[in-house]
Curated annotation (Swiss-Prot):
Residue intervals on the Vesicular side: 214-217
Name listed for the protein in its UniProt record: Vesicle transport through interaction with t-SNAREs homolog 1A
Membrane topology according to the record: Single-pass type IV membrane protein
GO molecular function: SNAP receptor activity
Amino acid sequence: MSSDFEGYEQDFAVLTAEITSKIARVPRLPPDEKKQMVANVEKQLEEARELLEQMDLEVREIPPQSRGMYSNRMRSYKQEMGKLETDFKRSRIAYSDEVRNELLGDAGNSSENQRAHLLDNTERLERSSRRLEAGYQIAVETEQIGQEMLENLSHDREKIQRARDRLRDADANLGKSSRILTGMLRRIIQNRILLVILGIIVVIAILTAIAFFVKGH
């Protein structure tokens, strides 16, 4: 699955590089070529959106414990896509103003100044938004790192607990084995004592029989 994601990543990188280059060229092109270039960029932006959707689907299939890194990369790609779309909108606005000025002459100069001022304010807002997104991403990454550390600590605690349980079981088994061996040793000693007593009794009986036999003669 990760190979598919990386393949989409490479396609997305190549495509966004082409889009960036074409957006930068739009202001310097003649009117006819600009129109064609704008249409071409629109088509490539749609292809880039489709690639992002495919990458997003791939990320959703990744197990949760391995998804964090890919999710961060997806956020970065979406931010890059948003910047491309913003740059393209500016390029289209400039292109539309240029076409309109060619049709209306100097009558649109004041409107163009207002639009430039509006674009400047929009750019400031977008920079602030990007800073907020970067701060949010850092906070999310920090939270994920903390969560991973807690999970690792939890796993380590479980391992220690299992090892402790195994030691406790082994200690209990050793105690049980010791009791069994002690009982067996006690029975062996008792059996040997009985054998000695029986041997003594047999010897005494034999000696007594011999004594009676000698006295009888």
